[in-house]
Amino acid sequence: MERPLDKVMTMILFGILKKGAARVTTREPLALEITDPLPEGLYAYETDFLAAFQKTDKVERQKALSEMVVSLIKSLTEKMKGFSRKETLEYYQSIMKTAWEQVEAANTPEVKSERYEQALEWTMLDKDYDDRTRDIFRTGPVFYPTWWWRFDPGHASAAGGGSIPAAIPGSRSAVPGADFAASVVNGIQNFSSN
């Protein structure tokens, strides 16, 4: 679906965080604490991504991330042999559309948040992801994804005083929808700029 590289990298990061393979220790510059042992079921590009973030030298990290991307593209090119590119794109567009429809159709903030968490990678494929996320979560409370504490270093340790309650890993805390949408979109933009 030819998305910008920064969006692809963010999708990989979120997938890794959802699987519990790492947590963000700082956002700028992005630093990860990698789980040991790694959880089962990671894709090769995910383990390559994590290996790149174990490198402390910025040039070495960039080189390792570049190699990961080249390897991922080669792998996808090989897997696409014999398939119609047009039909494949239409298929993934329909999955993305269905994912958004399920989020939008949810009747309660809890269900909407749960559906969004489940469909995050598919919704991120949307070129209008930023605006659509803001529109959908503009009003009402939103429950952070259960893995969000791995992405937002301040989220897990927020102790009173603010509008975001302290979070326990795996628990869900509610925030105003606009705040959540801004947090997701800004997190993606910040990661993309690193």
Q: Which residue ranges define each predicted feature?
A:
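Acidic, Ser/Thr/Pro-rich intrinsically disordered cytosolic tails and loops
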Residues: 1-194
